[in-house]
Amino acid sequence: MNKPVLVVMAAGMGSRYGGMKQIDPVGPNGQVIMDYSLYDARRAGFETVIFVIKHEIEDAFKAAIGDRVSKAMNVKYAFQQLEELPAGFAVPEGRVKPWGTCHAVLAAKPLIDGPFAVINADDYYGPEAFQVMYDYLSTHAGDDFYRYCMVSYLLKNTLSENGSVARGVCIKNEDGTLQSVTERTRIEPCGGGAHYTEDGGESWVDLPGDTPVSMNLWGFGKSFLDEAEQRFAGWLTENLPVNPLKCEYFLPLVVTELIEENKAKIQVLRSTDKWFGVTYREDKPLVVDAIAHKTAEGQYPEKLWE
């Protein structure tokens, strides 16, 4: 069994935040959020990282993080490109938005030869998540089912004080596997928990603070890439006529189909760490403070890669 590798999705445009937030410093020596994720991943056992980026940001990305991390990890690059579509499909006129998280992972397919974990570039996941993920991927191969996993967080540990967030709300089976994950695109804090709306704020549905949610930290086998690739053309046929400029091929979509078809079992691993991220510019000072606190406590050195 090959060692698990880490895939970092960094091609998104950071639309809500305005700017290339993946390389916006938050640490005491100019570190970005991704530095801390990669440092935690390396400590957990991951030795290879594949960055999925856009060609346009390649030089800036390497200067900001890739070259630095390459001192400690084997660094590879994959490029998510709009025109990378199945035969018979073309990019709709006016489309600039990337094709989503599943398309991002497919960009890395030629570089993946075993189990892999997927993370967002701009989320702080904490050390526990990478450890449980690495341990699972290192010890679980497929059998009668594809054996995948995800790390869930408590919803209350993933909210922003500065606006709504999108989260994958999870329901678990009795055996701890994932029954379903539903993307809620507008969740806001409310009392001790949260609530979400699907109709622009006309009505709200309460969610308890301890609801398990996905932060796009998934663990897959190589089989997932074949499944995602085979389903892409069908997804395009269905979605392009409806929403040509904004539709996105998301990881949970394929995960849900594989669960419904009884092909995959996705173990829900837990992290009690608090998530940090810069969804809005106003979030940044909170992240800077949190990192400073963790550094002062000795969880991270002042200089990560030296």
What would you call each of these model-derived segments?
Residues 2-66, 75, 80, 114:
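N-terminal glycine-rich phosphate-binding loop and ensuing alpha1 helix
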Residues 69-114:
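Short phosphate-binding loop-to-helix
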Residues 87-98, 163-168, 282-286:
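Short, surface-exposed amphipathic charged segments that create phosphate/polyanion-binding patches used
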Residues 114-124:
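Short beta-strand-to-loop acidic/aromatic patch adjacent to the donor-nucleotide binding site
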Residues 127-217:
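Conserved core of the sugar-phosphate nucleotidyltransferase
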Residues 217-229:
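Conserved nucleotide-sugar donor-binding
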Residues 228-264:
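A C-terminal functional module that forms or caps the active site or interfaces directly
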Residues 283-306:
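Generic C-terminus detector
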